[in-house]
Amino acid sequence: PYEKIGAELVKEVAKKTDDVAGDGTTTATVLAQALVREGLRNVAAGANPLGLKRGIEKAVEAVTQSLLKSAKEVETKEQISATAAISAGDTQIGELIAEAMDKVGNEGVITVEESNTFGL
């Protein structure tokens, strides 16, 4: 039963991360696993579960504020291309994404589908 609860938790973390960010599910899954493992270890050693929860919430807030403070707006087509190329691991794909985003605008939607056609 505990394994099923853990699996459901990880599934929910991955889904929520994908819904909100569209990326980072592996990182979120690893972080969730570490939080659960270390949380259980600390509770077993006598830590107060509510105090642990409050500490985690404070840490999340601090990390969030730090990330927001260091975040940079991606505004130009070149910046979008460079960022997309890093995410995709391919400069040509980065350029395609930047071109698509340039065409649809900031509020537009880009749908990517797998193709069975070679080279397209």
UniProtKB/Swiss-Prot annotation:
Predominant location category: cytoplasm
Keywords linked to the UniProt accession: ATP-binding, Chaperone, Cytoplasm, Isomerase, Nucleotide-binding, Stress response
Annotated SUPFAM superfamilies: GroEL equatorial domain-like (SSF48592)
Binding sites annotated in the UniProt record for ATP: D23, G24, T25, T26, T27
Enzyme Commission (EC) number: 5.6.1.7
GO cellular component, one term: cytoplasm
Biological-process GO terms, alphabetical: protein refolding
Subunit comment: Forms a cylinder of 14 subunits composed of two heptameric rings stacked back-to-back. Interacts with the co-chaperonin GroES.
Protein name: Chaperonin GroEL
Organism: Mycolicibacterium vaccae
Lineage: Bacteria, Bacillati, Actinomycetota, Actinomycetes, Mycobacteriales
Gene label: groEL
